[in-house]
């Protein structure tokens, strides 16, 4: 897996990596935040992973997501929001934004249903992850509002990460929120 540098996180809440974030996470959380490979595969080593789809639709991404993907303002992208429940491990909210036509392995994205996106992405030989950005959630971020809109508990005090990935020449943005009460048990 090679890295690409198409996006460098610039927003105040997102920091480039765990080392520069105030209030270091617990070691178990830090291991998840810095995972460069498939987070799904890591979770599946802990136990079965269940995917609960919250929303899948074409819509305009949030402004900072559009910037991260270098999208023109107002352009639509495929949005997928899910909750990953890992038996014996953490609970994670994941938000994926895929612009453009869905070609190659990403063409199956709208039909994934309750299968993890990570399996699809990391089965591709040419997957590339951009820089990881990390945020400590304080409760005012758009991510927290989205979670509340889905009736999920507030992740305030928890951690989030995001990065761009490139598969078959198509870039997407994946944001993952680690619920505070669900991460401490991760080994």
Curated annotation (Swiss-Prot):
A single GO molecular function term of this UniProt record: chorismate lyase activity
Catalytic activity: chorismate = 4-hydroxybenzoate + pyruvate
Record keywords: Cytoplasm, Lyase, Pyruvate, Ubiquinone biosynthesis
Catalytic activity, EC: 4.1.3.40
GO biological process: pyruvate biosynthetic process; ubiquinone biosynthetic process
A cellular component annotation (GO) from this entry: cytosol
Pathway named in the protein's UniProt entry: Cofactor biosynthesis; ubiquinone biosynthesis
InterPro entries: Chorismate--pyruvate_lyase, Chorismate_lyase_/UTRA_dom_sf
Localization in the cell: Cytoplasm
Chief localisation class: cytoplasm
Pfam families, sorted: Chor_lyase
Binding site for substrate: 80, 117, 176
Membership in a protein family: Belongs to the UbiC family.
Function according to Swiss-Prot or TrEMBL: Removes the pyruvyl group from chorismate, with concomitant aromatization of the ring, to provide 4-hydroxybenzoate (4HB) for the ubiquinone pathway.
Protein name: Probable chorismate pyruvate-lyase
Biological source species: Halorhodospira halophila (strain DSM 244 / SL1)
